[in-house]
Amino acid sequence: MTPATRAGERPLRILAISGSLRARSSNTSLLRLAVDVAPDDVEIVMYDGLATLPHFNPDDDVDVPPAPVAALRAQVGEADGLLFCSPEYAHGVPGSLKNALDWLVASLELPHKPVALLNASPWATHAQASLVETLTVMSTRIIHEACVTIPVARGDVDADGAIESAEIRQGVRAALDTFAGAIRSRTATRP
């Protein structure tokens, strides 16, 4: 029996956010794999609204923000943790992901939220560091032990965007186990 099934507890809910808008993105494929290999007591939900967010404008960040922004904030608020996987463009994160984070800066949903980062490319170190810096400034709780690089080559992703490599599957599952354990530990120690 898993911890989430004891005494009617709900599974941990993790929101997975890909920094890529590409249809066959290795980053999105890695997050979809996380959905497939997640422990039974962990529910991973893919965020699919990145392309629908308007460009961030503080003048539009009002009591009733644009609907896609409100939806993003609601999903972040409902999540026990956030799982990011992003490509690197010009030594940084893609503008679409940074835009989403900008919409979360003034919201109350993000501070102290546990975060883990998957990196699908061993060469995307600048984006990973940039994302860590941005999320740290935004007062998230980065679980460094669950932040891992799991190289995904083009040949690892099939025509449907699935990854079947046992090694990659095991790496993602290990990161999720670490992340879920850290979230539960944090929840158990709250006053």
Feature roles, as predicted:
Residues T2-L15, R141-P191:
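Glycine-rich phosphate/pyrophosphate-binding loop and the adjoining helix
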Residues R6-D41:
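N-terminal beta1-alpha1 ligand-phosphate binding loop
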Residues V64-S139:
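Helix-loop-strand module that forms the ligand-binding subsite of alpha/beta enzymes
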